[in-house]
Regions:
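Structured soluble/peripheral alpha/beta segments that form catalytic or ligand/cofactor-binding pockets
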Residues: 1-170
């Protein structure tokens, strides 16, 4: 909570946020073309992070995640605890890349439906990171009811991600 000043007027604000810090000893393992990553804040106060590192055929090299309960207890989710099933695709009119924007995420025998707030959330980072990818806001549904909201990142659908991209001279 705090204060936000807009046009010289102070307004009280309150909200929820998360800090995302990604690190690895390598960019992508051999055979991988990209990743699908999700961070969700659920309405019951819990939070979910789930990801998979993907081969060109769509199969997973790695699947992993964490589920933080409302009381702060954290549970690690391994390969067999998670499943990612794309349900609907969207093709970018700018890049021509086809992204799986709607998903069924399986978590230990239960599932969530992930729907984007809008399909067109493609980011063109060719001038900086060298990648075009889809990254945007999603809502999570269970049995047709909204149960959370979050962020989904989809990389490597246009071409495999590689280090050393970016603008000339970088």
């Amino acid at each position: 909570s705090g204060w936000l000043t807009v046009d010289g007027r102070q307004r009280p604000v309150r909200g929820v946020a998360w800090l995302d810090h990604e690190w690895s000893s390598e960019y992508l393992p051999e055979g991988a073309v990209g990743w699908d990553w999700l961070g969700l804040n659920l309405d019951d106060g819990s939070a979910l992070m789930a990801a998979r590192i993907r081969r060109a055929d769509g199969s997973a090299l790695w699947r992993f995640g964490t589920l933080r309960a409302a009381n702060g207890e954290v549970r690690e989710l391994g390969f067999d605890a998670l499943s990612f099933e794309p349900l609907r695709h969207w093709r970018s009119p700018r890049s021509g890349v086809r992204y799986p924007v709607s998903w069924r995420l399986g978590i230990d025998g239960t599932s969530l439906l992930l729907e984007p707030l809008m399909d067109d959330q493609e980011l063109d980072g060719r001038a900086s990171t060298g990648a075009i990818y889809w990254e945007g806001a999603v809502r999570a549904l269970r049995d047709g009811r909204a149960v959370g909201r979050g962020y989904l990142e989809l990389t490597g659908y246009g071409e495999a991600l590689r280090l050393g991209g970016g603008a000339p001279g970088r």
